[in-house]
Swiss-Prot record:
Its EC number is 7.1.1.-. Disulfide bonds: none annotated. It is a multi-pass membrane protein. It comes from Pseudomonas entomophila (strain L48). Belongs to the complex I subunit 3 family. Keywords: Cell inner membrane, Cell membrane, Membrane, NAD, Quinone, Translocase, Transmembrane, Transmembrane helix, Transport, Ubiquinone. GO terms for molecular function: NADH dehydrogenase (ubiquinone) activity; NADH:ubiquinone reductase (non-electrogenic) activity; quinone binding. The gene is nuoA. The chain crosses the membrane at residues 12-32, 66-86, 95-115. NDH-1 shuttles electrons from NADH, via FMN and iron-sulfur (Fe-S) centers, to quinones in the respiratory chain. The immediate electron acceptor for the enzyme in this species is believed to be ubiquinone. Couples the redox reaction to proton translocation (for every two electrons transferred, four hydrogen ions are translocated across the cytoplasmic membrane), and thus conserves the redox energy in a proton gradient. Signal peptide: none annotated. This is NADH-quinone oxidoreductase subunit A. It is an enzyme of class 7 (translocase).
Amino acid sequence: MSDSAGLIAHNWGFAIFLLGVVGLCAFMLGLSSLLGSKAWGRAKNEPFESGMLPVGSARLRLSAKFYLVAMLFVIFDIEALFLYAWSVSVRESGWTGFVEALVFIAILLAGLVYLWRVGALDWAPEGRRKRQAKLKQ
């Protein structure tokens, strides 16, 4: 048996599964476009507020702090994912892996202390001003 025939014979189940998933997605998208309503009007473009008349604008300006906190959450969440992968393989990695994990945690703590000292975690502006004045002295 040649290599390409062996590869096809080995992966035919995955190929059928992939075709089924793509076919199911195409079927659901096609069915929703056929059965869905096509009327576009003024009421369709208004935000839905549970049957109540809309009050105010749907576009709100958010503080940049929310985006900063979201980015910090994503970064520390990915770091937690790395630590979970290490904890699953702790027996295979031995002491070398343990030391590497400790170094990784130390780097994380250094980053957290830096963010704390800079004031990235402070929500109140007066606390940040006091901390920056103390650092300049």
